[in-house]
Design a protein with these regions (language model features):
Chain A
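Structural detector for internal amphipathic alpha-helices that build alpha-solenoid repeat scaffolds
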Residues: 2-13, 23, 30-43, 52-53, ...
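Short amphipathic alpha-helical segments that mediate assembly, nucleic-acid/protein binding
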Residues: 18-21
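Generic anion/oxyanion-binding catalytic loop in active/binding sites
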Residues: 25, 86, 181
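N-terminal, post-signal-peptide region of Sec/Tat-exported proteins
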Residues: 45-47
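Alpha-helical scaffold repeats of the Armadillo/HEAT/TPR superfamily
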Residues: 142, 174-181
Length: 202, 129
């Protein structure tokens, strides 16, 4: 049997250097930008690069890779880059931003008190979803404070949804006051009763 | 009570209390209700089971309601033809327009009364009120 010469190993694709990653992130093809987004976190200037890339990116899967990279960085600063996208008119962008913030609870928590007081009710509502990933005591305290001052029934409902899971006997008073404030909202009455039953049964 | 016992409704909403509220309203009128926690789970369900109506929230983790709608409408019939009632707290014109462009049959702004929900479910299921 003749000896078969083993083919030479193909040359390894050289890893892109830092400058290449930065260029790829902004100017590359969809696949290159996606790859670069995943590698950018290794660079010292990752945050400004990802911030710029996110503001320009129009392809959903690349945008998601950028959100994931920012979540992976897990800093208060990287959370701050994501937060404005909670206000997007595009539901997919809001979802991607929310998912990213929920993946970095420690960093998101720094911004949460401000988000729960945001002038935009839709932002306050999404902030309730971020609170869900905090330790139960922290989430309950923040959401009880929110419910005490909140005038929008949908935001109250979002907070009650989380409190039904995290709340304690201390939450019952706030829930009772909320029911009194919105007597004309049947969904809130239903949500409050269900939450109180669940908390009471624990 | 009208008989909607053969009408199957899929409720897609990440809020457990909302799903329970809708279920209570619809089951009281005889609808059969299935639930999904987000658009992705909703898609899995519509691919496996037949539904007369989907009631879909907009803001949900993993897959939002608008993306769900775009994907649903890109499927083959009869899946692509399932009537979809979008429910959301997003009351801006932009969101309503996005839902309409994505193929929503109607858009209801939360909070929604149980009677209203059941009434629209009956209309879209082709059942007499």
């Amino acid at each position: 049997m003749p000896l078969i010469r083993k083919p030479a190993s193909p040359p390894e694709t050289p890893a892109p250097d830092d400058r290449n990653i930065a260029e790829m992130l902004i100017e590359g093809s969809d696949d290159e930008r996606w790859t670069a987004a995943r590698r950018t976190t290794l660079l010292p200037e990752a945050l400004p690069l990802l911030t710029t890339a996110l503001s320009k990116e129009r392809i959903a899967r690349v945008r998601e890779a950028i959100f994931t990279a920012l979540a992976k960085m897990g800093s208060s600063e990287s959370a701050a880059v994501i937060i404005p996208y909670l206000r997007s008119d595009d539901a997919a962008q809001r979802t991607a931003a929310l998912d990213a913030l929920r993946a970095m609870p420690g960093a998101a928590a720094v911004h949460l008190p401000g988000l729960l007081k945001d002038a935009d009710a839709d932002v306050r509502l999404l902030a309730c979803e971020i609170a869900r990933v905090l330790p139960a005591d922290d989430a309950s305290r923040l959401l009880e404070e929110l419910i005490e001052r909140e005038l929008n029934p949908n935001v109250c409902a979002a907070a009650i949804e989380v409190l039904a899971e995290t709340g304690t006997a201390a939450s019952l008073k706030v829930l009772g006051q909320c029911a009194t404030r919105f007597p004309e909202e049947p969904f809130l009455a239903f949500a409050i009763k269900t939450a109180r039953d669940r908390i009471g049964s624990r | 009570m009208s008989d909607y016992s053969k009408k199957r409704v899929l409720v897609i909403d990440d809020a457990a209390l909302v799903r329970t509220y809708y279920r209570s309203a619809l089951e009281a009128r005889g609808f059969v209700v299935e639930e999904a926690l987000n658009g992705l789970e909703g898609l899995e369900k519509v691919l496996l089971q037949a539904f007369d109506l989907a009631i879909v929230d907009v803001n949900m983790p993993q897959m939002d309601g608008i993306t769900f709608l775009h994907t649903l409408r890109s499927k083959e019939l009869p899946i692509s033809g399932i009537p979809v009632l979008v429910t959301s707290t997003e009351s801006g014109m932009q969101d309503m327009a996005a839902a309409r462009r994505a193929g929503a049959n109607y858009y209801l702004v939360k909070p929604i009364k149980q009677e209203t929900l059941a009434e629209y479910a009956a209309i879209f299921c082709g059942a007499a009120r």
